[in-house]
């Protein structure tokens, strides 16, 4: 049986030339490199361009996305979509829950409030092994998944704008 998570979406609304922001948390450099590689490959395949903004950790990603959206709009070069990339590994305290839940909530709030296409590629895992399995482009490729999600939402936005 085909993996339903990988089934191509039928909407092929053109997203070539889209300007996409990637905000990445560089807390785990090697894992982040893999997430970024997967996301960039998907954007290139779709003909989208991208800028990368780096922040210290996952909690800083939502604010950085909001700041960048505002700055780009003010400069007359608005972003069409954004991708959040990072990794949160469970430790011995509740910090994991706070970071994973609050970053996801803030990204969702931002996307809904601004009607802005956003793919969340902040992986939340129990172990380094789980992180690698999710980050590698040849494996679960969560960076690529986040890019596909952002582009899918952009396609919906563009298609409905024409209706």
Curated annotation (Swiss-Prot):
The UniProt record lists the keyword Transferase: yes
Residues holding 5-amino-6-(D-ribitylamino)uracil: 27, 58-60, 87-89, 120
Catalyzed chemical reaction(s): (2S)-2-hydroxy-3-oxobutyl phosphate + 5-amino-6-(D-ribitylamino)uracil = 6,7-dimethyl-8-(1-D-ribityl)lumazine + phosphate + 2 H2O + H(+)
GO annotations of cellular component type: cytosol; riboflavin synthase complex
Positions annotated as active site in the UniProt record: 95 (proton donor)
Keywords: Riboflavin biosynthesis, Transferase
E.C. designation(s): 2.5.1.78
InterPro entries in UniProt: LS, LS/RS, LS/RS_sf
Gene Ontology MF terms: 6,7-dimethyl-8-ribityllumazine synthase activity
CDD domains: Lumazine_synthase-I
Pfam families per UniProt: DMRL_synthase
Residues involved in (2S)-2-hydroxy-3-oxobutyl phosphate binding: 92-93, 134
GO terms (BP aspect): riboflavin biosynthetic process
Pathway: Cofactor biosynthesis; riboflavin biosynthesis; riboflavin from 2-hydroxy-3-oxobutyl phosphate and 5-amino-6-(D-ribitylamino)uracil: step 1/2
Protein task: Catalyzes the formation of 6,7-dimethyl-8-ribityllumazine by condensation of 5-amino-6-(D-ribitylamino)uracil with 3,4-dihydroxy-2-butanone 4-phosphate. This is the penultimate step in the biosynthesis of riboflavin.
Family per similarity comment: Belongs to the DMRL synthase family.
Name the record gives this protein: 6,7-dimethyl-8-ribityllumazine synthase 1
């Amino acid at each position: 049986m085909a993996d339903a998570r990988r089934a191509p979406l039928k909407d092929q609304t053109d997203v070539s030339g889209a300007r996409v922001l990637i905000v990445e948390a560089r807390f785990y450099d090697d894992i982040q490199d893999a997430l970024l590689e997967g996301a960039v490959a998907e954007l290139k395949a779709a003909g989208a361009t991208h800028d990368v903004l780096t922040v210290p950790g996952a909690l800083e990603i939502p604010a950085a996305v909001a700041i960048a959206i505002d700055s780009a709009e003010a400069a007359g070069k608005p972003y069409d979509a954004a991708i959040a990339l990072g990794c949160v590994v469970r430790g011995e305290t509740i910090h994991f829950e706070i970071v994973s839940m609050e970053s996801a909530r803030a990204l969702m709030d931002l996307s809904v409030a601004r009607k802005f296409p956003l793919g969340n590629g902040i992986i939340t895992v129990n172990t380094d092994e789980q992180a690698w399995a999710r980050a590698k482009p040849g494996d679960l490729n969560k960076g690529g998944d986040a890019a596909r999600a952002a582009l899918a939402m952009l396609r919906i936005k563009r298609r409905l704008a024409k209706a």
